[in-house]
From Swiss-Prot:
Protein name (Swiss-Prot/TrEMBL): Glutamate racemase
Function: Provides the (R)-glutamate required for cell wall biosynthesis.
Active site: C72 (proton donor/acceptor), C183 (proton donor/acceptor)
Pathway info: Cell wall biogenesis; peptidoglycan biosynthesis
PROSITE patterns in the cross-refs: ASP_GLU_RACEMASE_1 (PS00923), ASP_GLU_RACEMASE_2 (PS00924)
Taxonomic source organism: Lysinibacillus sphaericus
Amino acid sequence: MNAPIGVIDSGVGGLTVAKEIIKRLPNETIYYIGDTARCPYGPRTRQEVRNFTWQMAKALEKMNIKMLVIACNTATAVALESLQRNMPFPVLGVINRGARAAVKKTKRHEVVVLATEGTIKSGAYEEALLSLNTSTHIIPLACPTFVPLVESGEYKGQFANNLIAEGLKPLKNEQFDTVILGCTHYPILQKQIEAVVGEDVFVLSSAEETAKDVEEMLAYNGTLADTNAKPAHKFYATGSVPIFRSIAENWLEQGTLDIHRITLK
């Protein structure tokens, strides 16, 4: 089935998920919406995030997608269940698979969750992790400066390194062996985060885990694209297309992308 996979995010963070899907499923077409004009979602109310997420989902429904990936942890926490109940296609989030991978990986059962304020407040990762192993000790840390840093495109260099180190300072005296990047923007900063937490700590990207979920769901439903299908990805941003283009083309390494401005309502 050569219909596109829909991917939505508060901004450019979901491109980390899109990249892993493209790598894992090279024949699939992705239609991506990044709500860059209203990013970040972390400080917003649950109702705002739910409304914005539904607007993106409805826009992609009109484009005849075969599956929707909510590539935003904050949006997954507040809108996944309602979308799964009401959409005519499978809807996946980014929290459960990341939690499963972390529980499998940790040896000491000491897990740090780096995420937005909204995701931390929702308790979604705590719920997912404890449902898998009640002995897991969870250290949640909101990193409100990280998403704006990525969205600005200025996430390389000493200023960015200093900002990341400052954001992770509360972990200095904590004991842990696993870190979940509980925001899809954060894998763009993964190398810098790894440099701060140290080489003995496993840093887990929910993007890679979510791409595995996508493949499994499509295979189960018999809706994988034909092996000779040529992808025709489309990207939509609610904010600046030039800034989105710069980040997307640099991150995805797919050449010149088909990117458009979109108005959601």
